[in-house]
Amino acid sequence: MNRLRNLRKERGYSQVKMQILTGIDQSDYSKIETGKRYYTFEQCKRIALALNTSMDYLAGLTDEKDPYPRVK
């Protein structure tokens, strides 16, 4: 999950900050980031929102970091 770690660092966030933003326990987040644990759809959504990116970017389906426009 290099993409996830790189984007988190690019945003200047620690794993503890990600815990606060996503509600995902820091130890679980660390396992997700190192590939020792998969994230659920809901966790992926929370991570994407916290990092201001798309779930597609996190999944490696696109190289575009900017999220799609949000539906109002």
Predicted feature residues:
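DNA major-groove recognition helix of helix-turn-helix
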Residues: E33, Q43, T62
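DNA major-groove recognition helix of helix-turn-helix/homeodomain DNA-binding modules
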Residues: G23, E42-Y57
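Residues that mark the N-terminal boundary/hinge immediately upstream of a DNA-recognition element
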Residues: R3, S14, T40-Q43, S54
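Short, charged recognition helix plus adjacent turn
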Residues: E10, L49, A59-K72
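Short alpha-helical DNA-recognition segment
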Residues: G12-T34
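A short, Lys/Arg-rich alpha-helix, primarily the initiator
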Residues: M1-E10
